Amino acid sequence: MRASSYLLIGTALAALAAPAFAQTPPAETGNTQAEEVAQNANQPPATEANTDIIVTATKRASTIQDVPFSVNAQTEEDIQRANANSLEAIARNVAGLTVQNLGPGQSQVSVRGVSAGQIVRDQPGVKEQVGVYLDESVISLSLFTPDLDLFDLNRVETLRGPQGTLFGSGSVGGTIRYITNQPKLGRTEGMVEANVNTVDEGDIGYGLKGVINAPLGDTAAVRAVAYGTHFGGFIDALGPAGGKNVNDGSRVGGRVSVLWEPTPELKITPRVVYQEAEADGFNRQEVYNLYANPFTVPPLNFKQRQQYLLLREKFRDKTAIADLTASYDFGPVELTSITSYIHRDILVSRDASALTGSVSVDLGFPDAGVNLPSNLRDTTKLKQWTQEARLASTGTGPFQWVFGGFYSHVDRIYHQRLPTPGYDAFVDATLGAGTSAAVANGFGPDSPYNADLPYVIKQTALFGEGSYRFNQFKLTAGGRWYDFKETRDFINGGLFAPGLTFIGDTTKSNGFSPRVIATWEPNRNLSVNIQAAKGFRLGGINDPLNETLCSPEDFALYSPFAAESYDDETLWNYEAGVKYSKGPITFNAAVFHTQIKDLQVTVDAGECSSRLVFNVPKAHTTGVEAEFSAHPLPGLDLSLAGSYVDSQFDSTIANPILATRTGIIDGNRLPTVPRFQMAATATYTQRFNDRAEWYVNASYQHVGSRYTQPGDQENNPRTFFHELPFNGQPLDASTTLNLKLPAYDLVNLSAGLSFDNGMEVVAYVNNLFDENPKLSFDRERNGRARLGFNVGQPRTIGVTVRKKFGGG
């Protein structure tokens, strides 16, 4: 990305607060007032660096210690001192939060071990298990969790456990909330930030960001944010499309929000957000590729962070959001309305030459046909309207409540094409004249697979929650009634496709998700809570198998489930938690047990290059999570967060061969989830002179072992038989791999000098010991055509300079 793409806008809010410590909590307030309280509270007072973090996890403002369930908030200062630039980086510091990296812009989020396996780009019907919000706007989208820039965020909240009562479907495991800094009346302030970094044995990264807050008279203010970041690549590609650092990328965007308060009671906040994220390649470290491997002539053994390409790859996500939040304070109650529109245009362009070439070998094509470059292009176009309106109490009495309605309309169109120039000529020459035209089903030439899947999803919901405090006890109860309808068409064609057309497939569901919480507060420093809550995820319909690609055994095993519906996933979460905060110490912990019914597990259908969803009748997660922070000495802050989760299937598929293939066996682990995860951070701050202070920060992060898909834990280590006699490879060539993703440890260091005039200079090293973590396993055609792992970023050394100014 060229430097001219970077936008600069002026100036800064003060850094946000350090981890939460006890003080007298604010009275709860409703809705938009709540966020104003939170924004103002999450600023460091002039005389004290430690203050309570205020969150709006219950759609009311309260301290983390007063929220009656498990919640974490990473503040702006936490994000800055961790040098984090993605949700994945944040997740390693949050107990119970896991982000599986499946390539740029393609992340799966799970909370507390509620995970159903790897969702891939061609499963648009699979719903997310964690809801994601930008302030009040729903932005969740299954695999494509938006990789939003973290600049000028007030905080990132992680709400653990099902949140369907207040946040709806998609929050079956939990909810992530990106909370932005809001416009401030009567204040001119801002910040500029510049960064440069170098990736070990990789490319240079750099970025420029800015924010400005300015008054528009006495009753309005505007806040504008702009940012541009270039991410240095670190994967080297061999082959005709090879090059150094092919997975570099960029993220450019901004947002503008306006606050208008014509009267003290009325607040109107329109906002527009735009972001374009791109990657010029994927972070895939290959072990075997049809075109280059230890058996080809000449042989090739891949080194660390290498891959082989016939075509360059690309990811692009253009996201536009327009929303309007309005509130009116009637005195005892406040009315809030949130209207939002989201438009996303996503492209995943992969080098699928190994996939297409492996099929061509099976079909007996000559080498020239096998060597054709083949580009799998998956596009997703999303238009989503949502409307929420709610009423909430605003007083300080013992009874507090919120009640509202929600509606959403989603149009999602998924296209898949496999352009392979010259392919039809080899098809007709090998399989008979006219074959390519006969299987096209109306699609264009030289594309052996094509599919169109338009979806329309409508949701209506009513929700409410109330709490009553009497003496040391508080009882909270609420629920959400929902009604979903999903309509889907499926049209495909080409040599690899079954050539089927389904119009108007419909999935419907309605129900009620309750939550009950009891809280005991024997004193102002301690609270104990117990909870029972239900979560829900909408079902759907499986796609048909790509029969041409299937082996006879795979077709017999998986065809009974193809083009069949799968049921809604539901769960009940039971937990008990404790929150303690006194003086320099804060300790929060929870134990939980989740019973899952009809878990929607995603599996690979062998060599068919198809994915199916299976309902597993019973599964569970049981675990404990804890977060501890302390301020034992002046200037020294310590924090420790960790979780242990035992997540397992409690059912076995009746067919023993299918059970082994899929890994859906009683006692097997749920995929993508580490049993143990922890993070420890230490920060020491001291005055440098009468005009500045310096600090050093060190963090250690441990992520335990995981499996990408449930079937990976069967017959592991596993031998993949390629059976592709091409380019010198024998028919019996095989590769043996351990599919258990090993645990990994990261150490990050930073040191900064912060001046009283708003200037800050930070030097940092992320991944100090240059760990090469395996984040997920990548396979093509059940491992026959390609094998590899998505890996993490190498050691990165950088410098960030910030300048804050204004404030009056």
Regions found by a protein language model. Give the residues of each.
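Short acidic/polar hinge/loop motifs at secondary-structure boundaries
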Residues: D122-G125, Q129-P162, G210
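C-terminal beta-signal and adjacent terminal beta-strands/loops
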Residues: Q701-F721, G752-G808
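Transmembrane beta-barrel wall of Gram-negative outer-membrane proteins
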Residues: D200-F282, A320, K381-Q387, A392-S408, ...
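N-terminal periplasmic accessory domains that precede
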Residues: L87, Q108-S110, Y133, T158, ...
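Membrane-embedded beta-barrel scaffold of Gram-negative outer-membrane proteins
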Residues: K209, D323-A352, S527-Q531, E564-V624, ...
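Gram-negative outer-membrane beta-barrel transporters
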Residues: A392, P398-V402, R469-L475, T586, ...
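N-terminal Sec signal peptide and the immediately downstream disordered periplasmic leader
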Residues: M1-A82, E88-N93, N213, P264, ...
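Structural signature of Gram-negative outer-membrane beta-barrels, strongest in the C-terminal barrel
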Residues: L259-T263, L391-T394, F406-S408, L453-T594
